[in-house]
C-alpha cells in the first residue's frame, strides 16, 4: 500500500508538520440531539426560521390540482374535510419540525380504529371517519421501537415497525402505533449507522450551517458594537 502526500518541514507546511492547517479537525458533535439549542435558534434567529420554513411553504403554497370525473358534490365534501381537519397546516408543521429537529411524525387518526398497533387497512375506513393528523416531533413523546420492518416490499423496509407515543410528564404510554399509521418527516438523510444512532431519524437542517451562522452573528455583533465607538 502506497500513500502520497505533500510535506515541507522547513516551511512547516504539509503532512506531518506543525502547520496550523494540519491541526484542523472535524469532531462529531451531533448537534441534532441538542433540543434546547435548536429550539432557541428557531425562536430567536430569523435566518433559521427561513431555512426551516421556506421549502415547506413553497411545497404547500399551491396545494394540489385534482383532475377527476368525480361528481362536484364529493369534491366539495373533500374540501370541507380538509378544512375541518386542517390537513394542509398539519402537513406543513410536520415538514417544518422534521427539518428543525431531524424527525417528526404525523399519526393518522381514524374514527373507530382504537387499536392503533394493528396495520392500517384502507378497506375498513368508512366515509367521514378520517379525523386528521396528529403531529409530534421527535422530542414530543414519540419513540421508535427496536423492531424493524423486514418485508422488502414495504415502503418502510428497514425502518421501525412500531412507534410508542408517551406522555412525558406522567411517563405513561398513550398508544403503540403501527408504522402504516404514521407519516414520517425527516430532515437530511444520514448514512445507515448515523441513522441508527439518531433512532432512525435524520439530521436537522440547522446542523450543517450552524458554524457559518455563529460566524455571521459574531461579525454582525462586532460591527454593531464598533458603531458606538466610531
Predicted regions: what is each one?
Residues 1-53, 72, 76-230:
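Structured, contiguous alpha/beta core segments that scaffold functional sites
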Residues 64:
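Glycan-recognition surfaces in beta-rich domains, encompassing non-catalytic CBMs
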Amino acid at each position: 500500500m502506497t500513500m502520497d502526500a505533500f510535506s515541507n518541514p522547513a516551511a512547516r507546511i504539509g503532512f506531518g508538520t506543525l502547520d496550523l492547517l494540519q491541526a484542523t479537525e472535524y469532531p462529531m458533535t451531533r448537534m441534532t440531539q441538542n433540543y434546547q439549542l435548536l429550539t432557541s435558534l428557531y425562536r430567536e434567529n430569523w435566518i433559521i426560521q427561513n431555512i426551516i420554513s421556506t421549502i415547506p411553504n413553497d411545497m404547500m403554497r399551491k396545494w394540489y390540482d385534482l383532475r377527476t370525473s368525480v361528481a362536484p358534490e364529493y369534491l366539495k365534501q373533500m374540501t370541507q374535510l380538509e378544512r375541518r381537519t386542517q390537513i394542509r397546516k398539519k402537513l406543513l408543521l410536520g415538514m417544518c419540525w422534521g427539518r428543525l429537529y431531524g424527525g417528526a411524525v404525523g399519526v393518522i387518526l381514524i374514527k373507530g380504529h382504537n387499536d392503533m398497533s394493528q396495520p392500517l387497512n384502507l378497506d375498513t375506513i368508512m366515509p367521514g371517519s378520517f379525523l386528521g393528523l396528529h403531529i409530534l416531533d421527535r422530542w414530543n413523546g414519540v419513540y421508535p421501537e427496536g423492531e424493524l420492518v423486514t418485508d422488502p416490499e414495504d415502503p418502510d423496509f428497514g425502518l421501525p415497525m412500531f412507534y410508542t407515543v408517551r406522555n412525558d410528564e406522567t411517563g405513561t404510554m398513550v398508544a403503540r402505533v403501527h408504522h402504516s399509521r404514521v407519516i414520517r418527516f425527516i430532515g437530511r438523510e444520514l448514512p445507515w449507522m448515523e441513522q441508527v444512532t439518531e433512532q432512525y431519524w435524520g439530521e436537522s437542517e440547522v446542523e450543517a450551517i450552524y458554524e457559518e451562522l455563529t460566524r455571521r452573528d459574531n461579525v454582525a455583533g462586532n460591527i454593531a458594537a464598533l458603531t458606538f465607538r466610531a
